[in-house]
From Swiss-Prot:
Subcellular location: Peroxisome matrix
Region listing for Abhydrolase domain, in residue ranges: 58-246
Family membership: Belongs to the AB hydrolase superfamily. MpaH hydrolase family.
Organism in which the protein naturally occurs: Penicillium roqueforti (strain FM164)
Primary role: Type I acyl-CoA thioesterase; part of the gene cluster that mediates the biosynthesis of mycophenolic acid (MPA), the first isolated antibiotic natural product in the world obtained from a culture of Penicillium brevicompactum in 1893. MpaH acts as a peroxisomal acyl-CoA hydrolase that converts MPA-CoA into the final product MPA. The first step of the pathway is the synthesis of 5-methylorsellinic acid (5MOA) by the cytosolic polyketide synthase mpaC.
Official protein name in the record: Type I acyl-CoA thioesterase mpaH
Active site: 139 (nucleophile), 163, 365
Disrupted-gene phenotype: Results in dramatic reduction in MPA production.
Subunit structure, as described in the record: Homodimer.
Keyword Hydrolase: yes
Gene: mpaH
InterPro entries found in the cross-reference section: AB_hydrolase_1 (IPR000073), AB_hydrolase_fold (IPR029058)
Length: 433
């Protein structure tokens, strides 16, 4: 259990201002709160100066607590590195953050907001987050942590991307409007049950093959007791299930309402076609990120494509962990790995040993909750390598800085910038422009 290995501290911090989409909140002046959990290992001895601070991002609608067994396993297998702390925040519209913000949230969601929220969180707690920082992201959390690295290229020493949603095309299982598809399922699914036990039974297909520790956390954090703003009348819900006689059973719903889960997966583009002329006109105030080539489609999601197109510039080194049975487009992930970090401003990419892809055969998109040890294994090996590199770079930088003046420029400046000819301008000087 994480509480046995970590001291768990909860925080509430403000979200970033202004949000990417004006329709994300009821009013644009609403202040959102972000629910954060800080996991500090219960070290027996002093913490090394180079212990890692992890910043993690969860998948769509998946409570941050589901990843606690992953942190337990990572802590147990540390070798060649130490953990200073692990910080995970629920996205503003999901889980505990969403509950805090439910009177302020509206029906739009951008993946670009959470990277800014995390950056705000990091600066807020900077005294508790010494370098090196390592980013961890699963699913759309992998996209989020990558965009945080774009926002501040030198923030992270390395990234661990677990089946990240970074690709040009929609997944092969489809994001179209016709079933079957994840968005169809999300919108039309049942979202209220007569008890927590009934909810777990109804969702057993989702948790099939999960580690029991993750199943326990699913039962605790994925659902929420009624009443809620969506379901304020508990007795009416009980009557719906003919459960009024069972006074001990409390009906539950999803901790992240299905509507917020849906708009995190896909975004509406219902008004691009002018009803009078029939022409497609992108509403720039709300849909500036719409690709004009596909502006006629009613649903889209811009961040996987925009993030993919910038992969060449990714500065931190990066480990991609991909499920062999993932629903994502594996061929496009392979192409993303090839270009990752290879461009101007990037890490150097695969050719310089800064980017690596590991495929885990037989594992699907939810592998952090299935074969936890199998997922942690390549992470540990990669962190050992990258921490060796980090320590070497720190030593070299320290040596280079020895004896340097912090008050005047070094002599090379005077060698490169030649002196001005005498007799120019007033008093022999050329005036500055």
């Amino acid at each position: 259990m994480s509480s046995e290995k970590f001291t768990v501290t909860e925080h509430l911090v403000p979200g970033s201002y202004i949000r990417e989409y004006p329709g994300s909140t009821v009013t644009q002046e609403d202040v959102l709160k972000i629910h954060v959990k800080q996991y500090t290992p219960k070290h027996e001895g002093p913490v090394p100066a180079d212990a890692i601070t992890f910043i993690a991002a969860h998948g769509v609608g998946l409570p941050k607590e589901l990843y606690e067994p992953l942190w337990d396993e990572l802590l147990e297998r540390t070798n060649g590195f130490h953990i200073h702390g692990i910080w995970v925040a629920d996205v503003a519209s999901m889980n505990q953050s969403g509950i805090q913000n439910e009177d302020k949230l509206s029906m739009d969601c951008s993946w670009m907001d959470h990277p800014r929220d995390l950056f705000l969180m990091i600066n807020h707690f900077r005294e508790q987050m010494p370098r090196p920082l390592v980013g961890v992201g699963h699913s759309f959390g992998g996209n989020i942590i990558t965009n945080l690295a774009y926002l501040h290229p030198r923030l992270f020493t390395t990234l661990l991307l677990i089946d990240p949603l970074i690709q040009l095309s929609p997944p092969s299982m489809g994001f179209g409007t016709d079933p079957p598809g994840p968005i169809n399922y999300t919108l039309w699914r049942n979202d209220v049950w007569p008890s927590r036990e009934a909810a777990i039974r109804a969702n057993r297909g989702l948790i099939h093959g999960w580690d029991p520790r993750c199943v326990d956390r699913m039962a605790k954090y994925f659902f929420r007791d009624l009443p809620t703003p969506l379901y304020p009348d508990v007795e009416a819900v009980k009557a719906r299930f003919d459960a009024a006689a069972d006074t001990t059973a409390t009906p539950v719903t999803l901790a992240t309402p299905k509507y917020h889960e849906l708009i995190a997966q896909i975004r509406q583009n219902f008004n691009a076609r002018d009803p009078t002329t029939g022409r497609i006109e992108i509403p720039r105030a709300t849909h500036a990120d719409m690709d004009p080539l596909v502006a006629s489609i009613p649903l889209y999601r811009p961040e996987p494509r925009s993030t993919f197109r910038r992969l060449g510039t990714l500065r931190p080194s990066c480990l991609w962990i991909v499920g062999g049975a993932t629903f994502l487009n594996v061929d496009e992930i392979h192409e993303g790995v090839k270009i990752c970090g290879s461009g101007i401003g990037g890490s150097g990419g695969v050719s310089e040993g800064r980017v690596k892809e590991v495929i885990l055969p037989g594992l699907g998109h939810l592998m952090p909750f299935q074969e936890i040890g199998t997922v942690v294994g390549p992470c540990v090996a990669w962190l050992q390598q990258e921490m060796d590199r980090f320590r070497q770079m720190e030593r070299e930088w320290g040596e280079e800085r020895k004896g340097k003046s912090h008050l005047v420029l070094e002599k090379n400046w005077y060698k490169v910038l030649k002196p001005m000819p005498s007799g120019r301008g007033k008093g022999g000087r050329k005036e500055k422009l």
